[in-house]
């Protein structure tokens, strides 16, 4: 097999591989989007947000509702400058 034939086979293989990978990434993106927007995904995000608010409230000494309304800058200032 000469170099030109090998090069053509390599290019065709690359084109086929690129199309297959594009399909795989598209299906992964669709599955992740469905999982993120599902009821279970939303409830897990809400639980995580509640746990973060409770952790921050315990660290800086405020109520969880106050911690939820604070911006990130306020939280960092309260943790490191008080």
UniProtKB/Swiss-Prot annotation:
Q: Which InterPro entries match?
A: Antimicrobial_7
Found in which tissues? Expressed by the venom gland.
Question: Which residues are part of the propeptide segment?
Answer: 70-82
Q: Which Pfam families match?
A: Antimicrobial_7
Task: Name the predominant localization.
Answer: secreted
Q: Quote the subcellular location field of this record.
A: Secreted; Target cell membrane
Q: What GO biological process terms does the UniProt entry carry, in alphabetical order?
A: defense response to bacterium; hemolysis in another organism
| Any single GO CC term annotated in Swiss-Prot or TrEMBL for this entry | membrane
How far does the signal peptide extend, from start to end residue?
1-22
Q: Zinc-finger: present as a keyword of the record? A: no
Keyword Signal (UniProt)? yes
What are the entry keywords? Antibiotic, Antimicrobial, Cytolysis, Hemolysis, Membrane, Secreted, Signal, Target cell membrane, Target membrane
Biological role stated in the UniProt entry: Displays significant potent antimicrobial activity against clinical isolates of Gram-negative multidrug resistant strains of E.coli, P.aeruginosa and A.baumanii with MIC values as low as 4.4 uM. Additionally, it displays low cytolytic and hemolytic activity against human erythrocytes reaching 50% hemolysis at 100 uM.
Additional observations: Adopts the characteristic alpha-helical amphipathic structure in TFE solution, but an unexpected random coil conformation in water. Is an unstable peptide when the venom is stored after milking. This produces a shorter peptide, named Vm36, which lacks the 8 amino acid residues at the N-terminus.
| Similarity comment: family membership | Belongs to the non-disulfide-bridged peptide (NDBP) superfamily. Long chain multifunctional peptide (group 2) family.
Q: What is this protein called?
A: Vejovine
Q: Origin organism of this chain?
A: Vaejovis mexicanus
